[in-house]
């Protein structure tokens, strides 16, 4: 069994299985109706004739080699000439329009005649090639919205401080290395977008924008925020994600109207205690920082409905924190340093719908920890150090998705039968030797992943999983399959690669919806049942490294449709050809 060595490292994929599946999927479906020579090739194979191409056994490829030529680019907007832009300006003036849309016209320079359009309140210039704005834009004193995103602006003219009514300024995706000084003088601004520039600092003059409700400066290179941000008392959304912040000023606690605070993907080492003053906060993004703790005062943010602390250095939470956050329904503590569940007892999970504890160092799920978690539907414990499951495991009746992959589980309790709502069960990369008979009670199960365990057989009760669509048994020690597998008529994906199978049961022919079948690397599999020919939807089949001597190389090279046709002609189903 493999395990993650580094913090961001995913568990290894066994023996190239995932790569094989990727290659096989590239083949795509092969339609028998499109291949006029298919029957003759099968006939040649029966007579012992060799394919002149000399294709290797186990190599799948598409028979439909038609090259679809790309259509010439259509619908692209032509570069607007200066005359066309002037024409648009004239039309706007003549019609006395208050809205001018010059977006995506490949404009390099705005005509100075724009100064005459003093009536407009909205000007859209996004998606052009502007490197600067003419000072004459400052004449547009009635502007309320100015959209300049997706240009190449490096500065703004000082004349813009005449725009006393401007409420929304969009400067996303430009080449600004600083917030243009004139921006701080636009005191009527309520919305300011500066995302994806090259800004390194926010100046103290930010306090001159007291009406701001929305400030987005994400995806820049900002290392600190000024204390003056605390004077933005009307701020509702503050997005500073994807920057280089190590600390937040304590004055952030003065912004008590904030409901959405996004700080993810920074270098934050701590949070100020004053964050507890943000009593209206409903969304707090802290994932991918360097936090080793969160302040106890966070418990005052009782409106939080989502808390994501993924990929920090946190090993514990303040006792009672989660119990106080009664509206949190999604909690992500993945990729941290937890060695045990947070202290606080069952009440801390009473409102949780989704809990993600992936990639920590937890070796035990405490008995009764979810006794009050009546709405818990998704639990991700992947990549921890679990060796067993709690005795009350069978009481998790509301669980819909359960991921226990990459642990050290040696068995699944028989009372797994109590998980009557479960639809997705991931148990890959463990040490399981067998499955409990109770698995057959999971009647809603759609996906069951048991890859890379030590299974030697499957219980007959697996036949009761009538809704199962994906069954992954890759890299185990299976020698046979139960005949009841034929009852899984909704199955579309069946992974059996890297086992010790000696044969497939003829009941596999009843899997009428099967689309993907992986049999690769079964060294004892010498033949395929004729009944496989009945799987008419089969489009991906991986059989490399199987000694299937009864299949001629040219048939194997032809892909699933060739193999199915060959099996039909060889067996009792030739009348279907």
Swiss-Prot record:
Swiss-Prot/TrEMBL GO biological process terms: positive regulation of Ras protein signal transduction
Composition skew (Basic and acidic residues), residue ranges: 1-52
A Gene Ontology cellular-component term: nucleus
Alphabetic keyword roster: Cytoplasm, Leucine-rich repeat, Nucleus, Repeat
Localization (cell): Cytoplasm; Nucleus
InterPro entries from the UniProt entry: Leu-rich_rpt, Leu-rich_rpt_typical-subtyp, LRR_dom_sf, LRR_domain-containing, LRR_R13L4/SHOC2-like
Domain of life: Eukaryota
GO MF terms held by the record: protein phosphatase binding
Spans of repeat LRR: 96-118, 119-140, 142-164, 165-186, 188-209, 211-232, 234-255, 257-278, 280-302, 303-324, 327-348, 351-372, 375-395, 398-419, 421-443, 444-465, 467-489, 490-511, 513-535, 537-558
A Pfam family this chain is assigned to: LRR_14
Region (Disordered): 1-53
Membership in a protein family: Belongs to the SHOC2 family.
Described function: Core component of the SHOC2-MRAS-PP1c (SMP) holophosphatase complex that regulates activation of the MAPK pathway. Acts as a scaffolding protein in the SMP complex. The SMP complex specifically dephosphorylates the inhibitory phosphorylation Raf kinases, stimulating their kinase activities. The SMP complex enhances the dephosphorylation activity and substrate specificity of PP1c.
Protein name (database record): Leucine-rich repeat protein SHOC-2
Originating species: Xenopus laevis (African clawed frog)
